UniProtKB/Swiss-Prot annotation:
HAMAP family: Dephospho_CoA_kinase. It is an enzyme of class 2 (transferase). This is Dephospho-CoA kinase. Catalyzes the phosphorylation of the 3'-hydroxyl group of dephosphocoenzyme A to form coenzyme A. Coiled coil: none annotated. Keywords: ATP-binding, Coenzyme A biosynthesis, Cytoplasm, Kinase, Nucleotide-binding, Transferase. Its EC number is 2.7.1.24. It catalyses: 3'-dephospho-CoA + ATP = ADP + CoA + H(+). It comes from Zymomonas mobilis subsp. mobilis (strain ATCC 31821 / ZM4 / CP4). Residues 3-197 form the DPCK domain.
Length: 197
């Protein structure tokens, strides 16, 4: 089994690439989705997050807007939050890998792959990248996203240039879905049949 780590900065189109891999019947571990499940009503991290960040839990689980507001006021809270979330994500990742070990290629979609130290868990890394003007346009068109919030999120991530330097594959996402799908097929063809490093 080859484990391909998929990452990219905010609004680069990583979710679209992840869906393309899934459409090719490749198992995809979606770290964002896992985190949402862990923070949903009855999610196993609710208690720990509620203790660390009072007032952020409601009937829908973790209220991400309230949590985000607390983190903007006290950025050191990011480390505390990551210390709660990352071990649970690692556990879920190990379960996913065990469940899918018979597949020749699995995709591990983790936005903070480099920043959170998940590179040791994958065999290869694909970085989704786009020109800055496209990235910014996509980001600020999202609900509840402002330019200052976008800049703050970018500041917490490795620069795109640095991610590209560490990548085994760079997926350029500045054109159209047809070009994007062709790159996904090319990477899949390159990796399937090779085995892990």
């Amino acid at each position: 089994m080859i484990i391909l780590g998929l990452t990219g900065s905010i609004a680069m189109g990583k979710s679209t690439v992840s869906r393309l891999f899934a459409q090719m019947k490749r198992p995809v571990f979606d770290a964002d989705k896992v985190v949402h499940q862990l923070q949903a009503p009855n999610g196993r991290l609710l208690s720990a997050i509620g203790q660390a960040f009072p007032g952020v839990i409601d009937e829908k689980g973790v209220n991400r807007q309230k949590l985000g507001a607390q983190l903007l006021q006290k950025p050191e809270g990011f480390r505390r939050l990551e210390a709660i979330i990352h071990p649970a994500v690692v556990e879920e990742l190990h379960l996913f890998l065990r469940k899918n070990r018979s597949h020749p290629l699995v995709i591990v979609d983790i936005p903070l792959l480099f920043e959170a130290g998940f590179t040791r868990s994958v065999d290869y890394i694909a970085v989704v990248s786009a020109p800055y003007w496209i990235q910014k346009r996509r980001a600020v068109s999202r609900p509840n996203m402002t330019e200052s919030r976008f800049r703050g999120l970018l500041a917490r991530q490795w620069p795109d240039r640095k991610k590209r330097q560490q990548a085994d594959f760079i997926i350029e996402n500045g054109r159209n879905i047809i070009a994007l799908a062709a790159q996904v097929r090319q990477i899949t063809g390159c990796l399937v049949g090779q085995g892990s490093r």
